[in-house]
Amino acid sequence: MCENQLKTKADATAQIEVIPCKICGDKSSGIHYGVITCEGCKGFFRRSQQNNASYSCPRQRNCLIDRTNRNRCQHCRLQKCLALGMSRDAVKFGRMSKKQRDSLYAEVQKHQQRLQEQRQQQSGEAEALARVYSSSISNGLSNLNNETSGTYANGHVIDLPKSEGYYNVDSGQPSPDQSGLDMTGIKQIKQEPIYDLTSVPNLFTYSSFNNGQLAPGITMTEIDRIAQNIIKSHLETCQYTMEELHQLAWQTHTYEEIKAYQSKSREALWQQCAIQITHAIQYVVEFAKRITGFMELCQNDQILLLKSGCLEVVLVRMCRAFNPLNNTVLFEGKYGGMQMFKALGSDDLVNEAFDFAKNLCSLQLTEEEIALFSSAVLISPDRAWLIEPRKVQKLQEKIYFALQHVIQKNHLDDETLAKLIAKIPTITAVCNLHGEKLQVFKQSHPEIVNTLFPPLYKELFNPDCATGCK
């Protein structure tokens, strides 16, 4: 194929990617098996055809398939793939008829026009939002360190409160929220379109902060209060203090211990990891419950944000317990590398998680920054079925405002926040891959998942079991 043909094909693919995935609405990567899809749906369809998979739907065979819940029902996802024309025998883009290509380009133009209209509408909002953030340079959160330094000696966490339902990681006290999240009575309400922070050029860079003022109704006192509350909540709900992590840094699993992990059955190691993930999620739930702004959201939105974002926060927090010098992570009291998780049969998931942790560590985030970024990831207005997405969005904007100031105080690199925001799709992708791997594991070991996995884990990542497999 000559150079001009390659360029034409690349240009065509780039144009096609303007159209969202026809299956789940995520960002598409081109035409796969005859339909415009994302990489996730392409891989799902390929695996379903290779394995001649037979899926069943536990509900009424009319499950909604979108970016957030596409992994919840494989039957309905596959049926949607087939209904929209996905096929192993589908023609490739270059072999389409002129009529098919014209129809496709008309759709591309329609989406491009819609995006242009959205950008014009958002530009006014971007200017207003930039004004909200702008005075962080001159006013800042100067009192933040002064007020927190007296509470946390040497920047380390104070002892966890010995309240009922919460415990120190090494104590024998009960875990929080063992009963899981109450999802009864949730109505599926169509999410209204919202403003995407990441789509606005230079919004979070230093140069976008001029001599503006806070938007009406927002004060620096409020931003300061939110930041202090989030940082305090984070420090009080981390499984390990930084001091403890430093002490454990070179406590690594021995060769014999690593061999023991590798010789475990796939079922046993999956169960072990599910327990550890659930343990970490319980701390994230407690973190969220201590955030004042989060608790002011309606209960429906609190639950939806936790269900869709808790694992993402666990992944962000993982960087605290990751040693980039030898690529090891803290697991069951000692550090170990990727080879420890070989028995899972999910090397790609483990690789992605480790790569993300290493990349996040390279930014050398402080505890303040991890706290604020974690809360921004959790309190995300683009989650499906939120009742009050605008309220969630406003809270997230205030968190990003505080985070931007803290970053500018700690880093010479003006682009640290932009780099953090750019990592959010990777966080989502790793968590989606976890969901896909769990579904594959469940197909071959349904009884293990149904009877031995923690109830909270099942409720969050395997909702079919949470309701019918107690």
From Swiss-Prot:
Highest taxon of the lineage: Eukaryota
PANTHER family: NUCLEAR HORMONE RECEPTOR HR3-RELATED, NUCLEAR RECEPTOR ROR-BETA
Keyword Transcription in record: yes
One GO biological process term: positive regulation of transcription by RNA polymerase II
Entry-linked Gene3D superfamilies: Erythroid Transcription Factor GATA-1, subunit A (3.30.50.10), Retinoid X Receptor (1.10.565.10)
NR LBD domain segment(s): 222-460
Organism whose genome encodes this protein: Homo sapiens
DNA-binding region in chain numbering: 18-93
Location of this chain's protein in the cell: Nucleus, Nucleoplasm
CDD domains referenced in this protein's UniProt entry, alphabetically: NR_DBD_ROR, NR_LBD_ROR_like
Region entry Disordered, spans: 104-127
Protein name, entry field: Nuclear receptor ROR-beta
Involvement in disease: Epilepsy, idiopathic generalized 15: An autosomal dominant form of idiopathic generalized epilepsy, a disorder characterized by recurring generalized seizures in the absence of detectable brain lesions and/or metabolic abnormalities. Generalized seizures arise diffusely and simultaneously from both hemispheres of the brain. Seizure types include juvenile myoclonic seizures, absence seizures, and generalized tonic-clonic seizures. EIG15 is characterized by onset of variable types of seizures in the first decade of life.
Gene transcribed to yield this protein: RORB
The record's note on its domains: AF-2 (activation function-2) motif is required for recruiting coregulators containing the LXXLL motif, such as NCOA1, and control the transactivational activity.
Motif AF-2 in this chain: 456-461
Biased composition, class Basic and acidic residues, residue ranges: 104-117
